[in-house]
Amino acid sequence: MAGGQDERVVFAASVEALLRAFGPPWKPGAREALLKLGIDPEQAPRAAYPLSLYMQLLAALGEIHFPDAIEDERYFQMGQAFIRGFERTLIGRAQLSLLQLIGPRRTLDRLTRSFRNANNYTTANLRELAPKHFEIEFGFVQIPGFYRGVLDAGLRAVGANDLSVELAKREALAATFTVRWT
């Protein structure tokens, strides 16, 4: 997929969300790790980044900020931090304000559209199992723990209480999560 229009990319808002989640001020080694990846936190983000670079960014920041966490928990915490950082971006504030008005149920209806502000490849199929109990299948997930953290923090931010987000199934690069709240 190198170089073509089918290349998976992550948009600036996603990189900006991670940067705002973790700095400044930067933990020792964080700024250097970013610069090594070609990301200068003092400069405006590029419009888009290759998915492979974003995965390296997640790994580097995760190891610096959550060094003692096992991998799945580290990425869960990264997903939660992503939402905290997203709330600090212009697009994030606007999007989360709208989603707070419509609540968790209708937020899930808009999931693919919301993820399209983050990247060019995420699709989500939603299935209602019962009121406030859903199954969400994502077509391409490299790090399920990260998605679980994003869903957890994102749904809490728009009003879901007593929330549970669990990985229900993993097939190739697809991942299915169950989500329920009160």
Predicted regions and their residues:
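Polar low-complexity intrinsically disordered regions enriched in Ser/Thr and small residues
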Residues: 26, 32, 41, 106, ...
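Amphipathic interaction/junction segments at domain boundaries or subunit interfaces
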Residues: 39-145, 167-169
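N-terminal leader/assembly segments
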Residues: 1-69
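Short terminal or interdomain "cap/linker" segment that borders an active site or interface and mediates
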Residues: 4-19, 115-148, 155-182
